[in-house]
Every structure is written in C-alpha cells, then in structure tokens.
From Swiss-Prot:
There is a cross-link at Y236-M262 (Tryptophyl-tyrosyl-methioninium (Tyr-Met) (with W-91)). It comes from Bordetella avium (strain 197N). Homodimer or homotetramer. Its EC number is 1.11.1.21. InterPro entries: Catalase_peroxidase (IPR000763), Haem_peroxidase (IPR002016), Haem_peroxidase_sf (IPR010255), Peroxidases_AS (IPR019794), Peroxidases_heam-ligand_BS (IPR019793). Residues 207-221 have a biased composition (Basic and acidic residues). Keywords: Heme, Hydrogen peroxide, Iron, Metal-binding, Oxidoreductase, Peroxidase. It catalyses: H2O2 + AH2 = A + 2 H2O; 2 H2O2 = O2 + 2 H2O. This is Catalase-peroxidase. GO terms for molecular function: catalase activity; heme binding; metal ion binding. The keyword Oxidoreductase applies. Binds 1 heme b (iron(II)-protoporphyrin IX) group per dimer.
Length: 748
C-alpha cells in the first residue's frame, strides 16, 4: 500500500472548529465585506444599466410568453400554463422584504442561494428557475436573474389577461448568499416559537395608522422585529392558520401584522391575496414524507434540484409542495373576479387535503364540478380556500374591502396592479433607479419622490462663498458635521431609502427623532435656511442652492476647517444636485422605520437592547454599505469632531474637540490608560491614568470595541501610528464623501 493511501486527506481548508464555534458572540466584521469583487465573475468595468438598456425587452417578453404554455415533460405545467408557477416565483422573490430594516426582497436575486432556495415555502421554485434558464442563457448578462424573476411574473400575469402597472429593471445580481439578513433564531424549519417568545417593546399602530408599517398590531402575538414572516422558512403567514390552527380570525391578525411589516396596508393586502389566488393552485397530492431533501441538502446528481418526490410520478397530479390541495377559481389561468365570487358565494367548512393539511370547501357539496383539474380534462373539482383566504371574509376591515372589490372589479384590478408593482419594486429605492421602457410615469408616495432639478446649480465660486458664509455663521464644527451626518446617514443600502437628498431631516418625522437632537437641529436648520434664502435671493437666471445641498456643503466646510486646524489643507469633495422634498411627498408612517434607534457613529441608543451596542454598530455600518476600515475611520473622526448625542461626551478622546486629528485612536490604545466599567450593565466606562488613578476619559461599548476586538484594534493601530495623520484625514474624507453621496444615484 502506498504512503498516499495510508495518509488520506481527512480535512480541507476551512474545516474544523471555527472561531464562530469557539466564540459564538464574536463581532461579525465579515458582514462588512460581503459581495466583493472577488465573488463577482463579471468584468470590473461591466455596466449593468448600460447592458440592460441595450436589451430588446419586447423580444424577451415575447420569449417568456411562449414559455408560459410550452409545457415540459420533466415538470408539466398546471392547466397547461406556467403562469401561476412564475407568479409564485416572483412573489416569493420579492416577498422576503421587510420594512423594519429594508433587507430581503427581489433586488439581489437571492432566491438562487441558501437559505431561500431551500425554504419550505419555496418548494418547486427550483423547477421554475430551471424552466427560465434557456431564456437567461439566450440574453446572458443583459438581464440579471433578479430582474428576470420579476419580469417573468409580470409576463405571466399579462399572458393570463391582466394589465400590469409597469416594470422597472435595474436589479443587479449578487453571487453569494446574503449573510446580514436576520431570518430568526429558530433551528428547525417552520419553527416560530422564538420569534414570538421575546418580550421586546414594539410600537403598536395607532388609529391614524402610524406604526402600522413596522410595529405590532392587535392580536396578542408579539412578533420580533424586524421579522415579517410568522415561521422560519415561510414568506408570509401560515396558510393553514397561526401555527397550523385553522382559525380565520386569528389568521387575519397574523396577516395584518405580516403585511404591514412588508409596507402594505389593508387594501393592498386584500388586493395581493385575492389577485394572486385568482390564478393556479397549491399542491398536496400526498403525505410530506414522500418528499426528499431540499436543494442545499440534495445529492450531487440532482444538480441543485431538491424535494424529489416519490409519490406516484412525482410531478403533475402527484406534486407535493405545501401539502395543501387548493384551486381557488374556475378559471385558474385567466384574470377574473371569481375569487371573490367563490369567497362570498359559498358558505365554507373545514376539511383536509390528501396530505392532511387544513383547508376549506363549500358546505353541502356546493360548487361541485366548477373547478377544472390541473392535468386531466375529464376531471372536475369543487373550489377550495385556505384559512388565510377565509380570513378576508371574517375580518370586518378586510371583508369590507373585499366586498368593495367584488362589486367593483375595475377597482380591484387597479388595486392589484399597483400593489403588485409595489411588492416587486419596494426594495429598489427611488424611481430614478428604474430602467427600461415600461417604467410608469406616475410618482408614487412609497418611492419617496424628490423633485427633479429645475434650476441652474451652484458653481465652484458659489460653493466657496457659501462655505465662508457657513463658517462665519457662529455654528460650531460639531453642529455642522452632526447635521450633515444626521441627514445622510438614514440611508439604507438594503432598500436604497433614506439619505441626504430631499432634505427630509427638516420634515416630520425626522426633525423630531431623538437621535437628531431636535433642539440643536432646529437651531442649525434656521441658520442654514437663512443663508440659503440670502444666497438664492441675490441670484439671477434662476440659480439656487437647495437646503439638501447646503446641509452637506456645510458639513464639508466644517471638516475642511477642522482639518486645517490640524495642519492639513484639504478640499472635501462636493457635488451639487440634491433637491428638497416637501412634507406632502413624505409619508410619515413609511419613514418611521428609518429612525435610527441606535447609531454607534453618534454614540446613540434610544433604549436598552438585548443586543450589545457594538453589534448594533455593525448592523448600522452594513446598512450604510461601509467596510470595516471605513467604519473605523469614521468613528475616529466623528468622535474628535465632537459628534455625539450624550451629555457625557463618551469617546471624545481629545483635548482639541473640533479638530480633525487621530487622537481617538492614539488615546484609545494608549497603555497608560486603564478602563473600568461605570455602569452595572457595562454600557459605559471610565479611563484612568494607570499611575495617578486620575480619570481621563469616558467611553461607550462602541468606543472600546475598537481597542478590544482584535481585528478592529489592528485597524485602530494603523490610524494611531505617528505617521498616520495624513492617511487618517484622507481616509476620513473619503468615507465621509461616500456616506454623503450614498443616495446620489444620478452620479453612479
């Protein structure tokens, strides 16, 4: 026997006990380096917008329309039409979005990857994606998977007689699973005990509807934020009822909370459920124990397909997906009002599917023979409903809307078209990001509209003059930088909302957020508005400076002054072109979830949380699309610029506040300082001179983690070095400029 045979490889790179195994509460800095160029197979200069705009979208749609009725033997189409399957694919791609943190949604094509590709609620969607491959192959990189999923859903609707509201492209694919999305703590599929077992305080929607988009609603179940789905591996609610209990009224409570957390009101919710369930069927031909492992657990020879079904033929009439066997309407491949006709036209009783799942059929055998079979023309069935469908009849608010839609089919069609468009585009950000010839002309309030630039912009000479005015206004460096940061740092890379453009910091609700220090904010805005009015009043030819631009420019001017006082003559990049939104263009309830209830960059915590502040900082930095070095240099710069929200001035490790130095890092890692907790919860600390015992500094957990965590300390050492001052200033300005321009999609 050879030596090679005697000494086989038992382990490979990355195997063995990991740091995460040893220290499960470690700071996950890798969340700040996701989706890097190293994972992207496309050329560095690939421009997706340019590629998509070169696409013949009509030709793509024509090919998709042909696919709808091109039934394949390996996965036959129900009723001879793949439309319902593709609607479900698009719906489930977009439906993971939640307004609480903006994560999830269709924007990255994440349905291709774990865990979503293997969620119990996504059974058989692996087949839908394989059916699409010939079209993706044909058009290649001109259309992303993310865009193709949603476009296919639209074409599915259109080929079944429905007029959609429009389509916007622009979703760029990623090439690895998202690691930052919190799907829940449950360790078993369809588990829901932990997301309802946490007693955190959450806002309850008031009568005006404020809070409905991200808080809990009445019903006694306290769903953990930011989750929207009721169970691990579901997109929305359990169709059988809460935890499988077939109680339509209780189901209505879950529906209202879940859809609200997806930014949908009651009318949009009814339209989406009824509109989606106008088409197709569910699948529960036999017991679930006939279904094999999900794609991520399947054998190599299955080539990424999962849920191999041993019941009968394993496909067609023998398909098992949800375990429910429901066909809602008599025309499952045609747009109609038949869902409501059946919902209100029959009295319903509980039954079970062949797989043993709870579902509903008309009482006394009514409706027999009115529903076609999906694969055998000689067979007919009774209509059937899910518990979550019956909820639309028993809940008073839903019932009122549903009857109105039943009696006004054109209104229903319009409501569904708009709700479907919102569902599939909610995570794309402002309308300026949409691509293609089918983008609707109408501005919608949930798109956070901002007026287009309609006047000449300030030039370099104007910028210099405005900087002088700002610096002579009596406002401090801290006040100017704080205001600019507050305006820009609402941005979320998850759903592309927030940011400095629009100057919504002067409007409700942002002007009243605790993190923005409303009194100081009002003072700064009053001065800046005066400078704006004076400048605009003296211009000819319609030239103006928006308040949105002036807020950012003022922050840049303050940083230049702070760097100058440290001996560095710098120019902070500034590009005009922001506009000011109005209060009428700002949905207060919709913006409420953007409130930073924690912001480590300003040492702010609205209340105490179970999650340590340093972990919340990583969450905030990830939403701001920052890398670990960018986060680090921003913290160090903002601290010495005296940007904070606490009276204790935690983390201001300098005797020259307002001057852009690397003092934060030098003093943090100085071994002459000994740190001690100053609160029982170890949320604040004091730094003492090791020799004299004299107190030198105070700090938060966020401050000290840059000296405690090994990776962050390594970064801090770079900026604390004697030769690092120039680099620190350069890197801070670069990271600052990035944040100020995160929502400047016109520059990208």
């Amino acid at each position: 026997m050879s030596n090679e045979a005697k000494c086989p490889f038992n382990h490979t790179a990355g195997s063995g006990t990991t740091n995460q195994d040893w220290w499960p509460k470690r700071l996950r800095l890798e969340l700040l380096s996701q989706h890097s160029a190293k994972t992207n197979p496309l050329d560095p200069d690939f421009d997706y917008a340019k590629a998509f705009n070169s696409l013949d979208l009509a030709a793509v749609k024509q090919d998709l329309a042909k696919l709808m009725t091109d039934s394949q033997d390996w996965w036959p189409a129900d009723f001879g039409h793949y439309g319902p399957l593709f609607i479900r694919m698009a719906w489930h791609s977009a439906g993971t979005y939640r307004v609480g943190d903006g994560r999830g949604g269709a924007g990255r094509g994440q349905q291709r990857f774990a865990p979503l590709n293997s969620w119990p609620d996504n059974v058989s969607l692996d087949k839908a994606r394989r059916l699409l491959w010939p079209i993706k192959k044909k058009y290649g990189n001109k259309i992303s998977w993310a865009d193709l999923f949603i476009l296919t859903g639209n074409v599915a609707l259109e080929t079944m007689g429905f007029k959609t509201f429009g389509f916007g492209g622009g979703r760029e694919d990623t090439w690895e699973p998202d690691q930052d999305v919190y799907w829940g703590d449950e360790k078993t599929w369809l588990g829901g005990d932990l997301r309802y077992g946490k007693n955190e305080a959450q806002p309850v929607a008031d009568k005006a509807g404020h809070g409905k988009e991200h808080g809990r609603t009445d019903g006694g179940r306290n769903l953990e934020n930011p989750l929207a789905a009721v169970q691990m591996g579901l997109i929305y609610v359990n169709p059988e009822g809460p935890d499988g209990n077939p109680d339509p009224q209780a189901s209505a409570h879950d529906i209202r909370e879940t859809f609200a957390r997806m930014a949908m009101n009651d009318e949009e919710t009814v339209a989406l459920i009824a509109g989606g369930h106008t088409f197709g069927k569910t699948h529960g031909a036999g017991p679930a124990d006939n279904v094999g492992p999900e794609p991520e657990a399947a054998e190599l020879e299955n080539q990424g397909l999962g849920w191999k079904n041993s019941f009968g033929t394993g496909k067609g009439s023998d398909t098992i997906t949800s375990g429910l066997e429901v066909t809602w309407t008599s025309t499952p491949t045609k747009w109609s009002n038949n869902f409501f006709w059946n919902l209100f036209g029959y009295e319903w009783e509980l039954t079970k599917s062949p797989a043993g799942a709870h579902q509903w059929i008309p009482k006394h055998g009514a409706g027999a023979g009115s529903v076609p079979d999906a694969h055998d023309p000689s067979k007919r069935h009774v209509p059937s409903m899910l518990t979550s469908d019956i909820a639309l009849r028993v809940d008073p608010a839903y019932e009122k809307i549903a009857r109105r839609f039943f009696e006004n089919p054109d209104e229903f069609a319009d409501a569904f078209a708009r709700a479907w468009f919102k569902l599939t585009h909610r995570d794309m950000g402002p309308r300026v990001r949409y691509l293609g010839p089918e983008v609707p002309a109408e501005d919608l309030i949930w798109q956070d509209p901002i007026p287009k630039v309609n006047h000449p912009l300030v030039d370099d000479q104007d910028v210099a003059a405005l900087k002088q005015k700002v610096l002579a206004s009596g406002l401090s460096v801290s006040e100017l930088v704080s205001t600019a940061w507050a305006s820009a740092s609402t941005f979320r890379g998850s759903d592309k909302r927030g940011g400095a453009n629009g100057a919504r910091i002067r409007l409700a609700p942002q002007k009243d957020w605790a993190v923005n220090q409303p009194e100081q904010l009002a003072k700064v805005l009053k001065v800046l508005e005066g400078i704006q009015a004076d400048f605009n009043g003296k211009q000819s030819g319609g030239k103006k400076v928006s308040l949105a631009d002036l807020i950012v420019l003022a922050g840049c001017a303050a940083i230049e002054q702070a760097a100058g006082q440290a001996g560095h003559k710098v120019t902070v990049p500034f590009t005009a072109g922001r506009m000011d939104a109005s209060q009428e263009q700002t949905d207060v309830a919709s913006f409420a979830p953007l409130e930073p209830v924690h912001d480590g960059f300003r040492n702010f915590l609205k209340s105490r949380y179970d999650v340590p502040a340093e972990h919340l900082l990583i969450d905030r930095a990830q939403l701001l699309t920052l890398t670990a070095p960018e986060m680090t240099v921003l913290i160090g710069g903002l601290r010495v610029l005296d940007v904070h929200t606490d009276k204790e001035k935690h983390g201001v490790f300098t005797d020259r506040p307002g001057v852009l130095t690397n003092d934060f890092f030098r003093n943090l890692i100085d071994m002459g300082t000994e740190w001690k907790p100053s609160s029982p919860a170890r949320e604040s600390f004091t730094g003492h001179d090791r020799k004299t015992g004299k107190q030198k500094w105070t700090a938060s957990r966020v401050d000290l983690v840059f000296g405690s965590n090994s990776q962050l300390r390594a970064l801090s050492e770079v900026y604390a070095s004697d030769d690092a001052q120039d680099k620190f200033v350069r890197d801070f300005i670069a990271a600052w400029t990035k944040v100020m321009n995160l929502d400047r999609f016109d520059l990208k």
